[in-house]
Regions:
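Short beta-strand elements
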Residues: 53-60, 101-107
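Hydrophobic residues positioned within well-ordered beta-strands of beta-sheet architectures
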Residues: 21-25, 71, 105
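C-terminal structural segments of small proteins and small subunits
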Residues: 77-112
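C-terminal binding/interaction regions
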Residues: 38
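Short, charge-patterned binding micro-sites
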Residues: 20, 58-78, 110-111
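Short, Lys/Arg-enriched N-terminal segments with co-localized hydrophobic residues
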Residues: 3-17
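Short glycine-/aliphatic-rich beta-strand segments at the starts of folded cytosolic domains
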Residues: 21-30, 35
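Structural beta->alpha junctions
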Residues: 28-32, 75-80
């Protein structure tokens, strides 16, 4: 793989910035009585969030527990405020679905 480096002083273009918003959401699924019911609810949440916010999102942990779930997500863009806004709206959307309650949300925004 070839990486091209150009001196920035020769060009009057703005330096390109990539902003990554990533995190882990822990959900309370107390009303679920089986893993099958939990998977059904999570599948619904993940599909709705993907379709609404165009985000990479998946169940990442706590697969064997039916009363709690952990999902990870990632947004990529070029504006820190826009990514932060999308994350806030996504969290509100998940809570508004009333399928599971957010216990904890760990969010990190990285600028490269």
């Amino acid at each position: 793989m070839t990486i091209w480096c150009f001196p920035l002083l020769q060009y009057r273009y703005k330096l390109c910035i990539m902003v990554i918003g990533t995190g882990k959401i822990t959900l309370n699924t107390d009303h679920c009585h089986s893993l099958k019911e939990k998977r059904k609810i999570l599948k619904s949440i993940l599909a709705r969030v993907k379709n609404t916010y165009n985000v990479s999102i998946a169940e990442i942990d706590l697969n064997d527990l039916h009363r709690i779930a952990a999902i990870g997500f990632a947004f990529v863009g070029n504006d820190r405020r826009a990514i932060n806004s999308k994350i806030d709206k996504m969290l509100e959307f998940i809570e508004s679905l009333s399928l599971a309650h957010i216990i904890e949300a760990q969010v990190e925004i990285i600028t490269i």
